[in-house]
From Swiss-Prot:
Optimum pH is 7.5. Optimum temperature is 40 degrees Celsius. It comes from Pseudoalteromonas haloplanktis (Alteromonas haloplanktis). It catalyses: Xaa-L-Pro dipeptide + H2O = an L-alpha-amino acid + L-proline; diisopropyl fluorophosphate + H2O = diisopropyl phosphate + fluoride + 2 H(+). This is Xaa-Pro dipeptidase. The gene is pepQ. Mn(2+) 2 binds at residues 244, 255, 420. One of its GO terms (molecular function) is phosphoric triester hydrolase activity. Keywords: Detoxification, Dipeptidase, Hydrolase, Manganese, Metal-binding, Metalloprotease, Protease. PANTHER family: XAA-PRO AMINOPEPTIDASE 3 (PTHR43226), XAA-PRO DIPEPTIDASE (PTHR43226:SF8). GO terms for cellular component: cytosol.
Length: 440
């Protein structure tokens, strides 16, 4: 924690400088950032799990407290309005005394509707940053989520401070503990539900604390890209296991994926090993000055090579790419920025005005197309799947004649493969946070 405290000072200074620059540029007196508020379920007295405004948690590691506000102008000490009610029904957050508290002038808020007297009186040149526009309007804000401000902040959030990088390393440490426990639970014959519980136990984080819904898939379920069901019964036969799961540290996310063959031998195990080798090489290809979209193209070339090498498609790799067959087996992007959000912002931006960096032709669904630069953090997550609906579409095209349908049927019980690491780009080196923690 001592290291984080030292790095946090520089982090706050960086956020202050960014705020000062954009406020001067847009003629604003400051930003008022709202943590959010609890959402009640329809016709009920229960609330959905609270998810904090990412602009709020970028300033401080308070991710579980609604009705908080930050008032910041980039020059003066930021003001934190911290919600701390008198409440015998729920746990009340402790008064802030952590390493970050000294960087804020803190005022306690007893009731959400009492916040107006703690906010700037004249709000004409203050911009509200948050989700609840009706609340902002009721409080007298006329400037809400201005696009030039958001574009500027989103663009610069791709450049992580040293504090943020340390938080991401810690998130990876926690997640890797979970992945190792989940792997062991799979090889011990566990169900998807059993594996999920093993993961949560190892990370010491609840399901609601995870940065996204864990994907814990066995056998054919590995072909469902965003599979978030947890089957309580173990299958009669364990073939394969795909886990896409992260962890949270101070509001920053890990996002890691692994795929395993239960028997650790046979053609699917060989395919997993081959994909892992390609994934590692793709990770090593991250270099300042390259466009991330170009790595996505390289990934398709590598997927085509796998399809050819394993006789799934009876064509040389170059022709598989030319005929656009790879998108049937690899229908998503190579990866994305990672930070305070799992799919972190700024991935499509060419500059701080928000100018769009177009994806490569024929690849419209990427989550990142940006120029790679130092202090950025990326996921690298190639995949190869046997998805019934996409294979059905392929079977209606002229390309069906080149598919080894017998081989496809043999692989279907395994569902698919995805391998994902979290990588920091430094000026003259790469830091694979995930593999540095010895997750195979």
């Amino acid at each position: 924690m001592e290291k984080l405290a030292v790095l946090y000072a520089e982090h706050i200074a960086t956020l202050q400088q960014r705020t000062r620059t954009i406020c001067e540029q847009e003629g604003l007196e400051g930003l008022v950032i709202h943590s959010g508020q609890a959402k009640r379920q329809f016709l009920d007295d229960m609330y959905y799990p609270f998810k904090v405004n990412p602009h709020f948690k970028a300033w401080l590691p308070v991710i579980d407290n609604p009705h908080c506000w930050i008032v910041v102008n980039g020059s003066d000490k930021p003001k934190l309005i911290f919600y701390r009610p008198i409440d015998f029904w729920h746990k009340v957050p402790d008064e802030p005394r952590d390493f970050w508290a000294e960087y804020f002038d803190i005022e306690l808020l007893l009731q959400p509707d009492q916040v107006e007297k703690l906010l700037p009186y004249d709000k004409a040149k203050f911009a509200y940053i948050g989700e609840y526009l009706e609340v902002a309007q009721a409080l007298g804000f006329s400037i809400m989520n201005p696009e030039p401000v958001l574009n500027y902040i989103h663009y610069h959030r791709a450049y992580k401070t040293q504090y943020e990088l340390e938080c991401l390393r810690n998130a990876n440490r926690i997640a890797v503990d979970g992945h190792k426990a989940a792997r062991d639970a799979f090889f011990n014959g566990g169900s998807e539900f059993d594996i999920q519980q093993a993961y949560l136990m190892a990370t010491r984080q609840s399901e609601n604390e995870m940065p996204y819904g864990n994907i814990v898939a066995l056998n054919e379920n590995c072909a469902i890209l965003h599979y978030t069901h947890f089957e309580p019964k173990a299958p009669q036969t364990h073939n394969s296991f795909l886990i896409d799961a992260g962890a949270n540290f101070n509001g920053y996310a890990a996002d890691i994926t692994r795929t395993y063959d239960f028997k650790k031998q046979g053609e699917f195990a060989d395919l997993v090993n081959a994909m892992t080798a390609h994934q590692i090489e793709l990770g090593k290809s991250l270099k300042p000055g390259l466009l991330y979209g170009d790595l996505h193209i390289d990934c398709h070339n590598r997927i085509a090579q796998l399809l050819s090498d394993f006789d799934i498609v009876k064509l040389p790799a170059a022709e598989i790419v030319e005929r656009q067959i790879t998108s049937t087996f690899f229908p998503h992007g190579l990866g994305h920025h990672l930070g305070a959000q799992v799919h972190d912002v700024g991935g499509f931006m060419r500059d701080e005005t928000g100018a769009h960096q177009a994806p490569p032709e024929g690849h419209p669904f990427l989550r990142c197309t940006r120029l790679i630069e130092k202090n950025q953090v990326f996921t690298i997550e190639p995949g190869l799947y046997f998805i019934d609906s996409l294979l059905g579409d392929l079977a209606q095209t002229d390309n069906k004649q080149f598919i080894n349908w017998e081989k496809v049927e043999a692989f279907k019980p395994f569902g698919g493969i995805r391998i994902e690491d979290n990588i920091i780009v430094h000026e003259d080196s790469l830091e694979n946070m995930t593999r540095n923690l010895l997750l195979d």
